[in-house]
Every structure is written in C-alpha cells, then in structure tokens.
A protein has these predicted regions:
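A short, hydrophobic beta-strand element within the central beta-sheet of small alpha/beta folds
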Residues: 75-80
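Receiver (REC) domain active-site loop signature in two-component systems and cognate sites
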Residues: 57
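Active-site residues of response regulator receiver
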Residues: 7, 54
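Conserved catalytic motifs of ABC-family nucleotide-binding domains
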Residues: 47
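Two-component/phosphorelay signaling modules centered on CheY-like receiver
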Residues: 10-31
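Acidic catalytic/metal-coordinating carboxylates
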Residues: 35-38, 61-64
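Non-catalytic signal-transmission and effector/linker regions of two-component phosphorelay proteins
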Residues: 1-2
C-alpha cells in the first residue's frame, strides 16, 4: 500500500513520516508533496491508496486537489 502526505510545511511532513512505523501498518511506500499541484502530479503517477493532506496550502488547497483526484482515484482514502 502507498501513502501520499501533502503539506506545505516540510517539518510537518518529515515529522509524520519519522514518527510512525508505516511498514507495521502495511504501508510499503510513503510519498510526499509540498502543495496541491505537486500532490496531484504525484498521486496521478503513483496512485496511492491513502492521501494524508493539509487543507490550506499555497497554489492549490487540499480540498481542490482531492476534488480533482476524485474521478481519477475513486478508491483512495483522503484524510485531512
């Protein structure tokens, strides 16, 4: 399973990644993006099953990104 973490704060992304044993939860790959536009590109390319996303980010909000992904990745689980 793949997880995508989308947040404009690098410290938040690295903190979430390093503080949880993702492999123990069945997450084999943790991807990250710094805003909604990059998150959209990475999600289209890698097709993560879970997307952990900040709501307020520059360039594209998390909500706008997930609205665009709704038809592309209908089975992905978004978490805000």
């Amino acid at each position: 399973m793949k997880l995508l973490i989308v947040d404009d704060e690098e410290l938040t992304r690295t903190g979430v990644i390093s503080s949880i044993d993702w492999k123990a939860l069945g997450i084999e790959e943790v991807l990250q993006a710094d805003d909604g536009i990059n998150g959209l590109e990475i999600a289209r390319k890698y097709r993560p099953e879970i997307i952990l996303c900040d709501v307020r980010m520059p360039r594209m909000t998390g909500i706008a990104m997930l609205e665009k992904l709704e038809n592309i990745l209908p089975d992905s689980i978004p978490i805000f």
